[in-house]
Every structure is written in structure tokens, then in C-alpha cells.
């Protein structure tokens, strides 16, 4: 049986004594890969969690820790470090209390993601159709700076949705459709970071 502590200790021997520069980050990724290649299942997640925390500690000298954690929550940063740093740099500059409030309202509303498709025929309020149209304009084929700007631009439609629409409608189909709409919106936030950690 492979012992997790032994695996991690062996992998840490691959790390340089100094944590300065990109060498540490690359060796950290290598150490994690060394461990993961020898195990499977749940223990793999535990190993990645350990090394992701090491990465966050290292990078917290340069970036806010909550931003690092938010950007690591939905995508494993060790899989694509370049992408991770790009997202961290953009989210670290975020200065939109209204966007944060809306994103967290969506996250609080969704105890779990809906697995249903949004059905336009079930819309009862104009704000529902408006929000869907706005969500559909958000493109991932842009820089993260531009992506964040898109989220900020659609936020008035998110606010109007919450002002005009009672999500938990007494009609179960209408309620489920609204939760599906919010799940779609949540996926747009999650592409960048877990806003609940900001």
C-alpha cells in the first residue's frame, strides 16, 4: 500500500531549497505529477490539494490569497499554470462590488446546479429573456481582461432579473427553468473564478 505522507515527502525532495523564481513553481508541478502518477482515485485529489496549497503559499507573496484560492477552486492550477496566473492577474484587479454581489447572490441561490436546459417558452417575465440574451453574448474566445469586462457589462441584466423575478415560483416548471438559467450564468462566472471566495 502506498502511504500518502511517504509519497509527498519523496516528492518534496524534488523541490529546490529556495522558493524564488519560476524554478520552484515548475518543480512543484513536477513533484505533484510524480506523486499522482503512482496513485489513483480519491488520493489523487488529496495530493493535488496539498501541492495546490503549496503553490498558493508561494504565490501569496505577490497576489492576494483569496484571489489565488478563488482561481484555483474550479480549475486545477497545476494542469495549466500559465492560464492560472493569467486569471489571477485579472481577478486581482477586479473592482466591481456590484458584480461580486450579483455573482454571490447566484451562488447562494443555487444549492446545487440544475441539470435542465433553459426553456424560453417557460419565461414569464421580460427580465428572464433579457438575461438569457445577455448570457449568450459572453464569449470565452477572448482575453481574461475582456471576459471580465463582459461579466461587468451584463451585470445590470442580472440585477434586473433579481429585482423583477421571483426565482422560487410556485409553478415547479417555472422555478426549475429559472434555476437552470442561473446555473448557466454561474458557469460564466466559474470560467474565471469561484466568486464566493472573493
Task: Enumerate the predicted regions with their spans.
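Amphipathic alpha-helical "coupling" segments that flank catalytic cores
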Residues: 1-198
